[in-house]
Amino acid sequence: MKELRRSALGLLLGLLLLVLNAFASWNSAATEKSGRSDAINRHITMLKLGKAQEKAAAAYWLGQQHIAAAPAIDPLVSLLGDTSEVDPVKYRSSKLPARMTLGEEAAAALVNIGHPSIDALIRVLKSSPVAEARKNAAWALGALHDTGATTQI
């Protein structure tokens, strides 16, 4: 009988440790997701309040977050018509032209965010009075290779 109690107690302790470990893993993932959300929100704020170079760096960073940065779509779309020149060498490691516009960087970020950007890009292409915004939206839609977008235009 004593051995049965020990076995049951051992099983109970093992189960408790398993539950605690699962909770710790879940909590760690939730904390990481919360930290990423905070960083995305900080970069979205930078899109709205920063100088052109800071906005471009924020747009690039958001694009690197892919679909997780979907909350940044509207602020990025609002930059598509911005012709301010930026220097991507200051925040990108890859070889790029020495100069590009903030609107072009925003378009590239929207492409990296992916499919959730399509409706907003179509809206810009159809209704923006700013030619540069329409040009960047058209480029982004082409880069997304979504054949369904052509039927909506």
Predicted regions and their residues:
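Structural detector for internal amphipathic alpha-helices that build alpha-solenoid repeat scaffolds
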Residues: 25-35, 53-68, 89-115, 123, ...
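A periodicity- and composition-biased signal for non-globular, repetitive helical segments
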Residues: 11-12, 61, 140, 153
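Amphipathic alpha-helical scaffolding segments comprising HEAT/armadillo-like alpha-solenoid repeats
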Residues: 33-48, 67-91, 115-126, 146-153
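Bacterial N-terminal signal peptides that target proteins for export
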Residues: 1-12
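Intrinsically disordered, low-complexity polyampholyte segments enriched for Lys and acidic residues
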Residues: 2-3, 21, 27
